[in-house]
Amino acid sequence: PNGLPMQYRGVTSPFGMRTHPISGVMRMHHGIDLRASEGTPVFATAEGFVQFAGGSGSGYGILVILSHNYGFETRYGHLSSAVVTPGSWVKKGDLIGYSGNTGYSTGPHLHYEIRFLGQSVDPANFMGWNAQNFKNISTLEPNVSWQ
């Protein structure tokens, strides 16, 4: 996965340890929170299989989970709605939903998460990854076995 999942107006919470804005408990934040108006289109950052789409029953609210090649998975949380269905295939850039304020959320945003073999990695490293800086990702993200 690479590139931006949506147009956004800033990062409200980066990847890493933080004090949770609702519970007040210090814990790992496994993604990046991107501020956006409710209803902003959200796009797949890589082609893949829709593993889950709908109400998560957890802090994610309405959630889309995509499974990608090479052990990658992306999660898109707090959506106002999902427009994909489990079992379908999406291409990079396909519309998958709209940003929202569902689940444990303090305002409209997208929680964007990338996992490699089940382990969370910093999405910011992948959001700026492109053909011009292709080799940089292997040094920026040491938690992925690139060979």
What is the meaning of each model-derived region?
Residues 1-60, 92, 142-147:
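Surface-exposed, glycine-biased beta-strand/turn segments
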Residues 12, 35, 67, 77-80, ...:
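Residue-level detector of conserved, well-ordered beta-strand and adjacent loop positions
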Residues 14, 53-54, 82, 99-102:
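Residue-level recognition of beta-strand microenvironments
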Residues 27-29, 44-83, 108-109:
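Zn2+-dependent peptidoglycan hydrolase active-site motif and core
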Residues 34, 63-64, 91-103:
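Short hydrophobic beta/alpha edge segments that flank linear recognition/processing sites
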